[in-house]
């Protein structure tokens, strides 16, 4: 726990608020539709001027010259194409719309792009995180006290202990790794868990050391007795069937 709190202190998380920024119309990037509309508008104006020039050259100043007869046809064609481009730019892309329409559209765009609240930026981590218009609640963890030993279930330990109040290290490890569902549901007061009173007690008396072969035999007998004592009761004994 102390190591975890030390790591948290090494990487503090700073939270600060940022006032929302409302982008102006000059900051908004020009879209592709605006570019296409502007291109069509200027192209139409240029073609219209060229068409008017050719029309004037063909029909007014050079009436008696045969070399300028092609201008009488080319001028109106260019003029019609230029007018068509101008109409497309004005009607479809709204390049020459009225001032009131532009102001209303800008208000709608500003209302859609404006965030509902302030922005919060989290720093002190791998990548800063920004929340727009979100409610942020800072969590302060409680101070960690001295490390306490992990609590052990006493009922589970009682169920693990053998009837003779002695168990081997291998048996204890196997019993501790097994789940405690059955023994927590059915305590030792059950008749199936009642131990015999004639079970021998092994207490250390003096500095006497028994024979190693005798110790192995006693451990084997204790393991067999523990397995016999821990055998689950029959189903009929636990749940009596209604008649």
UniProtKB/Swiss-Prot annotation:
TM stretches of this protein: 40-60, 73-93
Compartments (UniProt record): Endoplasmic reticulum membrane; Apical cell membrane
A GO cellular component annotation in the UniProt record: endoplasmic reticulum membrane
Main location: endoplasmic reticulum
Gene Ontology BP terms: phosphate ion homeostasis
InterPro entries according to UniProt: TMEM174
Top-level lineage group: Eukaryota
Keywords: Cell membrane, Endoplasmic reticulum, Membrane, Transmembrane, Transmembrane helix
Membrane topology note: Multi-pass membrane protein
Subunit structure: Interacts with SLC34A1; regulates SLC34A1 internalization by PTH and FGF23.
Known function: Regulator of plasma phosphate homeostasis. Decreases serum inorganic phosphate (Pi) uptake by regulating the sodium-phosphate cotransporter SLC34A1 trafficking by PTH and FGF23 in the kidney.
Protein name: Transmembrane protein 174
Organism of provenance: Pongo abelii
Gene behind the chain: TMEM174
